Amino acid sequence: MPFSAASSSSVSSIAEEPPPKKQHDPSPSCSSYLLLLPDEIILNCLARLPKCYYPVISLVSKTFRRLIASPEIYVERSLLRRTERVLYVVLRSHATETPRWYTLNFKPFGNDSNNHRLVPIPSFPSIPCWGMSIVAIDSEIYVLGGCIDNELVSTGFVVECPSHTCRLLPSMKQARGCAAVGFFDGKLYVIGGCNPLSVNWVEAFDLKTQTWESGLGVNNVEMHDLTIRSFAIDDKIYIMDRKNSFVYDPKEGTLETDELLDTQWSVGSCVIDGKIYTFGSKNRIWVFDPIAMVWDRLKGLDDLPDKRDGSRMSNLGGNLAIMFNLEKGSTKICCTEIRLERREGGKIWGTVLWSNIVITLKEPSTIVRCLTVTV
């Protein structure tokens, strides 16, 4: 039976209409799936990533931001053995004399060293302008003594670097400034920085009991009351004052001069693998082996610029980090990272991994300290 014109037109109009579009929901992102998981699993995933990615990941969601800011993530990183060595730097402005704390941030997405920057830590607690003793132990930084309003103080505090939170320590028995410090056998030793006739010339803070006790040792009038640098190596504490170098034995309570240390040791120095690295004579980096009792030049770095004055060194995960002013009075701070390698004959060689300006300040500043913390 033939179709009528009306029915034909109706069929034609139906055939010409485009089929309805299917509604497709946007595919959920990987982060959306991850957010459906319990916090414990998300935390475990985040803890496995390098810290340099955390600022970017924090922008993804409130959950990521909350977990990355929590102290639990650093506990998880420690359990997973994913901790990293982070460089902390104290700069003091020539204009205000106020110390400020910074961290060296290694940017993700490439190995371009121009991305490495010193970043200020706004939440870091203020410290005395002069004379404080600073030492890093694992993930914490201890700040002891110093001068406030022209008076030496006996107070101290510790900063938990993963969260940048601060807690006060019990006061030392003796107020002191520019004291030598060294961590040994669970105790933090503080030496000098006060009247050499004080009965508490040496004190030890027990990290387990959180108490101070007088340390072994006789008063030493030969050592200047202001020390410049100190390190704990094995079971001894090496001390530099304004004139001489000394070695303190906490077990025996003895303090002896070390003339060999005096020949090269300078303020800008650090300890790596039980050896002291320092800028010494002829603008060379020298290495002191306390067991062999010998200084030796770090090989392979004959063209380093003369940066002995005002530079600071630190152990950056087994590499040597050097922080220095670009030139005297400059507002530019530079950093150089050197890989260390022991070759035939026991000689230590250095290779520059990168070197560039890491911050430009508003006014010239002094590099007070460089130290590395595990987080």
Swiss-Prot record:
Show the CDD domains listed in the entry: F-box_AtAFR-like (cd22152)
Q: Where is the composition biased (Low complexity)?
A: 1-15
Pfam families per the UniProt record, alphabetical = F-box (PF00646), Kelch_FKB95 (PF25210)
Q: Which keywords describe this protein according to UniProt?
A: Kelch repeat, Repeat
**Domain F-box, which positions?**
31-77
- Stretches for region Disordered: 1-27
Query: InterPro entries in the record, alphabetically?
Result: F-box-like_dom_sf, F-box/kelch-repeat_ARATH, F-box_dom, Kelch-typ_b-propeller, Kelch_1
Q: Report each Kelch repeat as a residue range.
A: 140-186, 187-232, 275-321
Is Repeat tagged as a keyword?
yes
Q: Does the keyword Repeat apply?
A: yes
Protein name as it appears in the record: F-box/kelch-repeat protein At4g39240
Q: Native species of this protein? A: Arabidopsis thaliana (Mouse-ear cress)
